[in-house]
């Protein structure tokens, strides 16, 4: 989940408001029902004493202090599906703090891992959060995009979702597609699209003040600790990987998330996606010719198909 280029800009208030209203009016057929309790779905990865729940067990909190952060992962692996969670991010001065919500084929940063990332980059009080997304295939990432948001993600819960099938990866915020990452059989060797390895879903909070905020210029203010991110309403509709004969190797399309309508954006989603591209994109590796004099193969694939 490293990054090499840090660029931060902001969109105008009027543009953000317009997009917000557009998103509110957008319709979508995507739906998923929250599934069971935290204990049914997840294990704590480390620092259990930095994990708390609400009295009813429906809200889960991860905290970071100057000793350690905390993280959890699903008990099961999946290959393709719809994965969704509501998050409320660290409020106030969160510079240097990263909340990560991602899928990975390994429990750790292995050299051959596949990975699909949401990373929420904290900032000084009053400055906007930035969402960074990234995609890894066989240990190679460097496919960062960054977006600003049309709301304050620290004030309330918002839904962050991943649609993953063999045709596309789509990152959603409140049902609005902010990034579309396509597969293609026209690209040689397919060294860019993660479609072979099953993945766990993870979330964690950790200190990344060497790069997360203004390229590392803004450091974490530990006087403001603990920093807390909150979660609820995890939902998954995916193919659970079960050895030795996982059903996920099948090429059938019985599930909605792997049928034709899920292979591309709907007309309404394309409208929302177009507004995001025009107004909220902060950085796109496919447009960084200084970093990539020869752009990666996948940058030539249209997200609109």
Swiss-Prot record:
Disulfide bond: present as a keyword of the record? yes
Catalysed reaction(s)? breaks a beta-(1->4) bond in the backbone of a xyloglucan and transfers the xyloglucanyl segment on to O-4 of the non-reducing terminal glucose residue of an acceptor, which can be a xyloglucan or an oligosaccharide of xyloglucan
Q: What is the first-listed, main subcellular location in coarse terms? A: secreted
Arranged from A to Z, the UniProt key words for this protein are:
Apoplast, Cell wall, Cell wall biogenesis/degradation, Disulfide bond, Glycoprotein, Glycosidase, Hydrolase, Secreted, Signal, Transferase
Q: Which residues form the GH16 domain?
A: 32-231
Per UniProt, subcellular location reads as: Secreted, Cell wall; Secreted, Extracellular space, Apoplast
- Disulfide-bonded cysteine pairs: these are 239-248, 286-299
Q: Which residues bind xyloglucan?
A: 119, 132-134, 142-144, 210-211, 215, 291
Q: Where is the active site?
A: 115 (nucleophile), 119 (proton donor)
Per the UniProt record, the site (Important for catalytic activity) maps to 117
Where does it sit, as one GO cellular component term?
A: apoplast
Q: Does the keyword Cell wall biogenesis/degradation apply?
A: yes
Gene Ontology MF, one: polysaccharide binding
Please give the residues the UniProt entry marks as glycosylated.
61, 66, 123, 138
Q: Which GO terms describe its biological process?
A: cell wall biogenesis; cell wall organization; xyloglucan metabolic process
- What are its E.C. numbers? 2.4.1.207
Record-linked Pfam families: Glyco_hydro_16 (PF00722), XET_C (PF06955)
Quote the PTM field: Contains at least one intrachain disulfide bond essential for its enzymatic activity.
InterPro entries (alphabetical): Beta-glucanase/XTH (IPR044791), Beta_glucanase (IPR008264), ConA-like_dom_sf (IPR013320), GH16 (IPR000757), GH16_AS (IPR008263), XET_C (IPR010713), XTH (IPR016455)
**Class of this enzyme:** transferase
Q: Where is the signal peptide?
A: 1-31
Q: What does this protein do?
A: Catalyzes xyloglucan endohydrolysis (XEH) and/or endotransglycosylation (XET). Cleaves and religates xyloglucan polymers, an essential constituent of the primary cell wall, and thereby participates in cell wall construction of growing tissues.
To which protein family does this belong? Belongs to the glycosyl hydrolase 16 family. XTH group 1 subfamily.
Full protein name: Probable xyloglucan endotransglucosylase/hydrolase protein 8
Source organism phylogeny: Eukaryota, Viridiplantae, Streptophyta, Embryophyta, Tracheophyta
């Amino acid at each position: 989940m490293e990054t090499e280029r840090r660029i931060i800009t902001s969109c105008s208030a009027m543009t953000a408001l317009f997009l917000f209203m557009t998103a509110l009016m957008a319709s979508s057929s995507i739906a998923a029902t929250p599934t069971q309790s935290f204990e049914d779905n997840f294990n704590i990865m480390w620092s259990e004493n930095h994990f708390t729940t609400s009295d009813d067990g429906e809200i889960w909190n991860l905290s970071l202090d100057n000793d350690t952060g905390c993280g959890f992962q699903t008990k099961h692996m999946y290959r393709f599906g719809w994965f969704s969670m509501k998050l409320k991010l660290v409020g106030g001065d969160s510079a240097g703090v990263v909340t990560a919500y991602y899928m990975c084929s390994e429990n750790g940063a292995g050299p051959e891992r596949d990975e699909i990332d949401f990373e929420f980059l904290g900032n000084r009080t009053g400055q906007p959060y930035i969402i960074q997304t990234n995609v890894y295939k066989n240990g190679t990432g460097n496919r960062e995009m960054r977006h600003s948001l049309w709301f304050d993600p620290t004030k309330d819960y918002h839904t962050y979702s991943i649609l993953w099938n063999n045709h596309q990866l789509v990152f959603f915020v409140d049902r609005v597609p902010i990034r579309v990452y396509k597969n293609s059989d026209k690209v040689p060797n397919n060294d860019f699209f993660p479609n072979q390895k099953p993945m766990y879903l993870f979330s964690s909070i950790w200190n990344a003040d060497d790069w997360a905020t203004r390229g590392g210029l803004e450091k974490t203010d530990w006087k403001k600790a603990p920093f807390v991110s909150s979660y609820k309403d995890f939902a998954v509709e995916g193919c659970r990987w079960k050895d030795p004969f996982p059903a996920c190797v099948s090429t059938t399309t019985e599930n909605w998330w792997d049928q034709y309508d899920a292979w591309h954006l709907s007309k309404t989603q394309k409208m929302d996606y177009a507004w995001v591209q025009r107004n909220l994109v902060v950085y796109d590796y496919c447009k960084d010719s200084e970093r990539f004099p020869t752009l990666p193969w996948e940058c030539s694939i249209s997200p609109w198909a």
